[in-house]
A protein has these predicted regions:
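Structural motif corresponding to alpha-helix initiation and N-cap regions
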Residues: 17, 40, 58-61, 83, ...
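A contiguous active-site-proximal alpha/beta segment in oxidoreductase catalytic domains
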Residues: 103-176
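Short active-site oxyanion
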Residues: 30-34, 54, 71-73, 123
Length: 207
């Protein structure tokens, strides 16, 4: 079986808790060959932890998607950047896994789909419960049943922050470049204006 080479964009909480550990546990099937984040601290820490050479640690996602040793790109950064990164990956001929939600607008989601179709690659939104062991086992059990007359699903939505703090050792960066902070703020203001109208008043936009 050929090992799939993965490039990771975004090294925050979901990458540290879910994606990087799982990819490492599946090391006969996947290899993380490159990582990208705007935080030098996270790049250094995750690079050391997962044995990624310095030459494969990037602060610009365009450098990562252009690499020949990346087959699939994991888009795990903040949602307002999903479309830009995913489209660039598709245009570079890479398959893409995007953390949920796929994008903030239907327009951006459609642009991702168009880039996927044009490039002939696969794009998947990472709703992981479909592949969770409990779900897979439940599907197998249901197949063995005769006629199903009643179905009830119970889900416990807990306090995730408490669980994360007690069970994980997540690194949170304190070295995000100021221009990146300003860019994200500008994008969020633009999204708010799009949602409620630019003439709604400054106080309402800030809310």
């Amino acid at each position: 079986m050929r090992v799939v080479r993965a490039g990771i964009i975004g090294l925050g909480e979901v990458a540290q808790i879910i994606h990087l550990p799982i990819l490492e546990s599946l090391n006969t099937r996947f290899q993380v060959t490159a990582i990208c984040d705007i935080s030098p601290m996270l790049l250094a820490a995750m690079g050391e932890r997962y044995r990624i050479p310095a030459s494969a640690r990037h602060t610009d996602f365009r450098d990562l998607v252009a690499r020949d040793d990346v087959d699939v790109v994991f888009v795990l950064n903040s949602t307002e950047y999903h479309a830009e990164c995913a489209i660039a990956a598709c245009n570079a001929g890479k398959h893409v896994l995007i953390e949920k939600p796929i994008a903030l607008t239907i327009e951006d989601a459609s642009l991702i789909a168009s880039a996927r179709d044009k490039a002939g690659v696969q794009v998947m939104v990472g709703y992981m419960r479909r592949f969770a062991p409990a779900f897979v086992e439940a599907v197998d059990e249901v197949r063995n049943l005769d006629r199903i007359r009643y179905v009830r699903v119970r889900d416990i939505i807990g306090h995730n922050r408490l669980i994360i703090e007690q069970s994980s050792n997540v690194l949170y960066p304190d070295d995000i470049p100021q221009e990146a902070v300003a860019d994200r703020q500008a994008r969020n203001r633009e999204m708010t204006d799009t949602a409620i109208g630019e003439d709604s008043g400054a106080t309402l936009r800030r809310a």
